[in-house]
Amino acid sequence: MLFRSEEIIIPYLSPVDGRWHRYFPDFYVKVRNRQGLIESRILEVKPKSQSVPPKVRGKVTRQYLKEVAAWGVNEAKWKAAEEYCKDRNWKFNVITEEQLGI
């Protein structure tokens, strides 16, 4: 097993400002899967509230607009990470407190 933290850099285009930025995923791991094969994965750990699009709750507030912007940036990062992984035959996962059991 191999474990690295925030060592991979993935470029992504931000929908908020239309500029290119660098995304540093939380973890890169190499593990042996159930079939005994070595598998590479990029893992991002986020609160569940940041891993789903925000819901409109009545009046549009500044907080809601911040949540929409954060969701847009996260979605752009994750799409870039999925492409990065696809090109290398790796897997990309967003992990929340649900998967961690907390």
Predicted regions and their residues:
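Electrostatic, structured charged patches in enzyme active sites and in nucleic-acid/phosphate-binding
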Residues: 1-102
